[in-house]
Amino acid sequence: MFDKLPYEIFKQIAWRIPQEDKISLTYVCKRSYESIIPFIYQNLFLNETYHINGDYDNSFGTCYWSVLNFHYIDEDDSNTKNDMSNRRLAKVKFSYFERTLAESPKRLCPLINRIRCTWHLNEDVMTNVLKLLSEYGSNLKFVDQFVRSSVNKGLEPLSKQLKTLTLTPPTLMPTHNSVSGSYLNKIDRLLLKCDLSRLEKLSIHINALKYFKNTGSPMKIKALVLNLRPDTLNLAEYDASDDFLKELEYIDIFDASTLRQLEILSWYSRDDFPSGEEGGFDRLYVKWGLEGFWKFPNIEKLSLASLVYSEFFLMNCLAVFHNLKILKLDYMGKFDFDVSLINFLSKQVCGKKLQRFDIHCQLNHRLFFPMTDNPLTRLNFDGFCPCSTCKNTIHEVILKKIFPETRSKLLKNPNKFQAHNFFYQMFFENKIMPYTNIIDNESPAMGWDSVPIETFVRKFNENLQSTIENTENITVNKITREDAISLYHLYLHYLKDVFKVFEQSLPNLEYLTINGIPTKIIQVDELQRCAVPLFYNNGYKSNSVYELVDAEALFS
């Protein structure tokens, strides 16, 4: 039946089903195989770590992208025989992809339109893939998110057809050396080979205010990724007079009417900041001319990563970018959660339009883990959700399994808290949250520095077992996968007031990530909205939703 659908209907279905279902369709019949294969190869996300499906929406990210599919290997588990490491498995899967292209290059390579790289892809395999694409990839238009110059070298034969350009850095990580003339010559050659009239996205690791001094008319790009590096701020060979540099702004280089997406990523360490006498970290905003972006009124997506927080800069961005729909704030150092910031955002024009918000901030809560050396310290559950589910988790999991030696919530040895601190273990030590880039509409979730929840459970139980004093012959029960999910849900309930600020202030918000925890904002009824987790969602019930009844129902 599926293979008999008109192509236009088939096409609409294909764009709405995840990769797993697309693969299943290849086995239905020959016509179905031939119809679905272009949708599998059109947009490729080349990952070097395992992909994770969400249980709230298992299609998240893979309706648009196709990923390299492989599982996580728990290399530290002595009970499991592992024939290879995660890194080795990733290379093998990547090489299988290369082999598949090599077997049918004329049929498969022309199907590829977009490739998203990740930084640590095996360089040798990537070189071979690019050789195939340079010869047969006639429809390849977009290749992005890479930092190695070798990728640009492989893409040179396709320069005129590409709509993306990455001006890679002189070295992977910033150094204290000045930029060499040979590096600048390479960048010059890249730019000369590129058709700037076709360019839609530019990623640059060099000071644009100095490098692009003779571009002529502004580039009509849609997306700009600006990397701030201490080693590419000053370009001696491109320096002009001070008077000229003061006049040059980003609006002279990029067309303000076309730029829609702006990502600013700082590579500065604390040691690289200007001294207090020179203006401190605020001086970086001035040196890179970032205030010049306030003249770009059509920005719809703004990402600020690894910068030091500047209230002045952010507030002006929110006030000027009336069309802002996507916002990411991931600052270096201290950035406290501030209700006044969200209130300010809600009063701006963009506050009514914002759909996706990713924020990393300090919530300044200590939960029940005491910050004291007092040998007799009581566990404190004040502020926790009073619902029956949370009460059950506290009594059946926390008190009976994690702190079985406590009496009346009294702790005997605070020095061993870190092994018992399941929140720290869950979100920092053995993270269960995959990296979910909600500001990219269709980006799949990846387990960069996270582990499956089963691995977290094993490691937490091992840490717990090694620290529990069992002098009273107390039965030590290991936590289970279900217990771990209950602890995660307990934490989400604890954040009720934080979620409520966003839910009530930003009426069109669809996705919200707080400190790496991705959620979907759903409309419960005509009056209420709530955040639900994208991962480990099964069994979750929001504690911010109330049953609404009318007078008739109340007294019937």
From Swiss-Prot:
User: Which SUPFAM superfamilies does the entry link to?
Assistant: RNI-like
Spell out the subcellular localization from the entry. Answer: Vacuole
Give the classification, highest ranks: Eukaryota, Fungi, Dikarya, Ascomycota, Saccharomycotina
Organism in which the protein naturally occurs: Saccharomyces cerevisiae (strain ATCC 204508 / S288c) (Baker's yeast)
Please give an example of a GO cellular component term from this record: vacuole
Q: Which GO terms describe its molecular function?
A: ubiquitin protein ligase binding
Which pathway is it part of? Protein modification; protein ubiquitination
Tell me, in a sentence or two, what this protein's role is.
Answer: Substrate recognition component of a SCF (SKP1-CUL1-F-box protein) E3 ubiquitin-protein ligase complex which mediates the ubiquitination and subsequent proteasomal degradation of target proteins. Probably recognizes and binds to phosphorylated target proteins.
Keywords of the record: Ubl conjugation pathway, Vacuole
Q: How does it assemble?
A: Interacts with SKP1. Component of the probable SCF(YDR131C) complex containing CDC53, SKP1, RBX1 and YDR131C.
Q: A GO BP term, please?
A: SCF-dependent proteasomal ubiquitin-dependent protein catabolic process
This chain belongs to the protein called F-box protein YDR131C
The F-box domain covers which part of the protein? Answer: 1-44
Q: Can you tell which superkingdom this protein's organism belongs to?
A: Eukaryota
